[in-house]
């Protein structure tokens, strides 16, 4: 996740479609301002209170489905292209997101269940996923992350407002249920990058008379 994330474009069709299934996640994501997280933190706090975990879990599943659906529209060449963050490829960016979404929710679950390790390592943000991964493996990574999230979210239920020791260098500290929601916000940041890449491929001049994407 980059601290210099671009502000969302609220007129994107995919955004409105996703918001129907993930209103809290997309609503919090809309609060992002370039380089600042104060607005999204406020939105996350207001939407991830007591009793929110089960609803947020369903929304995370919808976001995971949207990620996989978008990945499946991309041509093979896209996964080695710039991924919209730092110098990562698309494959590295989505591999990063798959690991991050599971890790953030697992952190909330460990804190909620009283199992936070005393020797927990310092969080290192913006770690790229593996190089050279293709469509099928990225889809599997997202699916595996969602299974981890589903198990972890069950431990957060009833503990959404509990404090979590996770101290993220870019976000700071959030409560257990807030990490569940923020994982989805982070997903949508990368989903936006994927849509921009898909649009750029779709709109580039065709060299063989065929559309590039879609």
Model-derived features: where do they sit?
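Short, contiguous alpha-helical
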Residues: 2-45, 80-122, 161-214
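Weak global preference for isoleucine
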Residues: 25, 32, 38, 56, ...
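Short, contiguous, helix-prone interaction/anchoring segments in small proteins
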Residues: 40-79
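A short, mixed-charge helix-start or loop-turn motif at secondary-structure junctions
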Residues: 46-53, 128-132, 169-176
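Amphipathic, non-membrane alpha-helical segments in soluble helical-bundle scaffolds
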Residues: 50-61, 87, 91-94, 135-142, ...
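Acidic/histidine-rich alpha-helical segments that form the ligand environment
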Residues: 59-72, 107, 123-163, 181
């Amino acid at each position: 996740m980059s601290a210099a994330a671009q502000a969302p474009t609220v007129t994107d069709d995919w955004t409105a479609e996703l918001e129907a299934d993930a209103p809290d996640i997309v609503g919090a994501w809309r609060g992002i301002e370039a380089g600042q997280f104060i607005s999204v933190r406020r939105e996350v706090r207001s939407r991830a209170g007591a009793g929110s975990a089960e609803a947020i879990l369903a929304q995370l599943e919808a976001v995971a489905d949207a990620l996989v659906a978008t990945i499946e529209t991309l041509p093979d060449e896209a996964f080695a292209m710039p991924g919209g963050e730092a110098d990562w490829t698309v494959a590295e960016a989505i591999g990063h997101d798959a690991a991050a979404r599971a890790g953030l929710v697992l952190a909330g679950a460990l804190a909620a269940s009283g199992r936070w390790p005393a020797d927990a390592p310092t969080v290192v943000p913006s770690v790229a996923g593996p190089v050279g991964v293709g469509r099928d493996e990225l889809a599997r990574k997202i699916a595996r992350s969602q299974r981890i999230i589903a198990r972890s979210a069950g431990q957060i239920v009833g503990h959404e407002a509990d404090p979590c020791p996770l101290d993220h260098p870019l976000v700071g500290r959030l409560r257990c249920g807030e990490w569940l929601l923020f994982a989805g916000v982070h997903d949508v940041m990368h989903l936006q990058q994927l849509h921009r890449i898909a649009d750029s491929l779709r709109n580039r001049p065709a060299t063989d008379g065929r559309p590039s994407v879609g």
